[in-house]
């Protein structure tokens, strides 16, 4: 199994169980699904017998519909307007560029040109995206973008390839 972590915060962003697709060698688009999770206790897991005097004891249980990738990686929803996202992205891309200059200098020009091409389309449809950050909520870390596929039902996330560290387990 491969886990992709934010290179700055170290937060897990996604794993290969979500079948990431590398787009133009610059971003991963990762499809996700809605799932229902239980927020309560399963009474079968409690090691006790129901009281004979009081009838059946109930355990309150609630369910919630969540996106599996958000739930599994413990991503946190955040919000940006276009102006604040541009400011964040400028600083984040600078940090990625500095990292690439140290670790993989020949990748810098490819990264710069391709990320600019991709982000032009993001900004054209900026209001369609939701924003998620890693579990540590590090303000310098990656902000993943979430939108829906053309069917309007399937959520997908966008992660910058060069902002990730891949670990194999």
UniProtKB/Swiss-Prot annotation:
<dbReference type="Pfam" id="PF00838">
    <property type="entry name" value="TCTP"/>
</dbReference>
<protein>
    <recommendedName>
        <fullName>Translationally-controlled tumor protein homolog</fullName>
    </recommendedName>
</protein>
<dbReference type="InterPro" id="IPR011057">
    <property type="entry name" value="Mss4-like_sf"/>
</dbReference>
<dbReference type="GO" id="GO:0005509">
    <property type="term" value="F:calcium ion binding"/>
</dbReference>
<keyword id="KW-0106">Calcium</keyword>
<keyword id="KW-0963">Cytoplasm</keyword>
<dbReference type="GO" id="GO:0005737">
    <property type="term" value="C:cytoplasm"/>
</dbReference>
<dbReference type="InterPro" id="IPR034737">
    <property type="entry name" value="TCTP"/>
</dbReference>
<dbReference type="InterPro" id="IPR018105">
    <property type="entry name" value="Translational_control_tumour_p"/>
</dbReference>
<comment type="similarity">
    <text>Belongs to the TCTP family.</text>
</comment>
<dbReference type="InterPro" id="IPR018103">
    <property type="entry name" value="Translation_control_tumour_CS"/>
</dbReference>
<comment type="function">
    <text>Involved in calcium binding and microtubule stabilization.</text>
</comment>
<dbReference type="InterPro" id="IPR011323">
    <property type="entry name" value="Mss4/transl-control_tumour"/>
</dbReference>
<feature type="domain" description="TCTP">
    <location>
        <begin position="1"/>
        <end position="169"/>
    </location>
</feature>
């Amino acid at each position: 199994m491969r886990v992709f972590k934010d290179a700055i915060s170290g937060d897990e962003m996604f794993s290969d169980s979500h079948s990431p697709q590398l787009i133009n060698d610059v971003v991963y688009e990762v499809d996700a699904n809605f799932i229902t999770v239980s927020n309560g206790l399963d009474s079968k897991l409690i090691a006790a017998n129901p009281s004979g005097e009081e009838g059946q004891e109930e355990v309150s249980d609630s369910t919630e519909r969540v996106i599996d990738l958000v739930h599994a990686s413990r991503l946190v929803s955040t919000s940006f307007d276009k102006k604040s996202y541009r400011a964040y992205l400028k600083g984040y891309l600078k940090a990625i560029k500095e990292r690439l200059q140290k670790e993989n200098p020949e990748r810098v020009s490819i990264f710069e040109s391709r990320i600019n091409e991709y982000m032009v389309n993001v900004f054209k449809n900026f209001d369609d995206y939701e924003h998620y950050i890693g579990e540590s909520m590090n303000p310098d870390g990656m902000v993943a973008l979430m939108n829906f596929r053309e069917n309007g039902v399937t959520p997908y996330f966008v992660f910058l390839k060069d902002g990730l560290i891949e670990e194999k387990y």
